Amino acid sequence: MEDKGDKALLELAYSEMYRSMIAKDTVALGQMLTDNFVLVHMTGMRQSKHDYLRAIADGTLNYYSCDDSVLEISVEGDTARMTGRSRVGAAVFGGGRHIWRLQLKIWLERQDGKWFMTLIKAGTF
């Protein structure tokens, strides 16, 4: 059964994730991710939590804006899944700055009452 409080917390987590990515606040972003977190890029490349945070910090991944977000959220007990669709301003892996129609499928788990991201699969919509 989905709790409206959980949905609000997960919506906030999505917004905070992008705020942290844009600000290059890898400490705040890292606190949202499990130690075994994996990001799967749209190319299929996989990044560990450490590698993902390092790529944000060193400028390999640059995020500038996130607009027009639409979220679908489902919660089952201590696990949740979000699909977020946003227009994201980014320059990644040495490419130019573009607006991406980015879709993130995000898996989360609740630990000690707090939600953590375990897996993100990126694509476009």
Model-assigned labels for residue ranges:
Residues 2-31, 38-125:
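A beta-strand edge to alpha-helix "cap/lid" segment located at domain peripheries
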